[in-house]
Every structure is written in C-alpha cells, then in structure tokens.
C-alpha cells in the first residue's frame, strides 16, 4: 500500500502544470564585442548641379556634364567598380522678393554613386569627378565587401563575454553556471567607418585618411544555476 501511495504521489507531481512546479534558479547575462577590420570597399557620391532659364535647358546641361563625369569615373575604376544614379531632380527657382513668388529659372540635380573595390582610389575618384564637372561631393563611406567573417568573430567574442559575465554573477551567489537554456543575438551587427579628410598639398590628389571598420555584436544568454 505504501509503495502504491508513493508511486501515486510521484505521478501526481510529474503531471503538475508547469507553472505549479518549482522553478529552477537561472542567471541572465549579456556580452558585447567589437572587432576592427580594414575596409576593402568605398562608395563615393558626387553631385552635378546645373541652373538655367528653362527646365529643359537645365536638364540638357546637367546631362552633358553628368555624361562627362560618368565617363571619367569609368576610366578610373574600370572593371573594379560600379556606377549608379541615386538621385535626380529638377526644381524651379524663385525670386526671394516678396510678396509674390516669381520663377526665375530651374535647377537640375544628379547624384552619382561609384562603388570601388580599392579604397586607395577614393581621393582620385573625387578629383576625377570634380575635374569632369561634378559640383559637390555628397558623401564618402567605407565598408567591407564580405563582413560575414568579421561578424561571426564579433558574435563569438560577445558570446564568450556573456558567459564570463554569467559566471561572475553565479560566483557572487555562491553557485555555478549550468546548462545554457537560451542564447540570443541582441540586435543588428553595425559596421561603421572612421574617415577624415587630411590636409592637401598643392597639386596633390584629395587625401583621404581611412580608419578601420568596427563591427559590433551583442549576445544575451539565460542559463541554469547549480550548487
């Protein structure tokens, strides 16, 4: 009879709803890591702005200069780059004298982005574009053609840091880290670039000082605590 009663008690305990069963203590911790790498790709954006009395004249002038800029950039990058138009617009220009707004002409804007798989050509790309007629430099961005290896390295380091933090918490409680129950990436890995324009000498190519691309990762874990 006693054996039967004990078996029934064990069976009843095993069939209790999860919320009624004793909860095991857990520890939650997170870790972050940053891995630096030299960029191997640069995107240079340049703009061509033209103004004329009519929209057609502004567009035609812009098309002529933009064609010259594209031809010059193709000659520089060859098969080692890619060109595309990222923005194009034609807008009226108004006289600033109140009270009426009179159209005085039209302005056409064309933005070209060149992707180059050789970061040392960034300065030359700016020089070539402006010499061919580009009126402004819109932006300069360095990146990695294949960020995956650096991303995985950052994730591994962030995971190790999360585990180290969990062990420190457990030690402070006089316990140990047991089985890891959950491991989750804590957000997007964000590569960004430290880039500065250096001082230029007379007749020199536009100097670009390139910093490393930093890839950041964060990971959070939840693990059991054991005695």
Residue ranges and their predicted role:
Residues 2-227:
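Short, charge-dense linear interaction motifs
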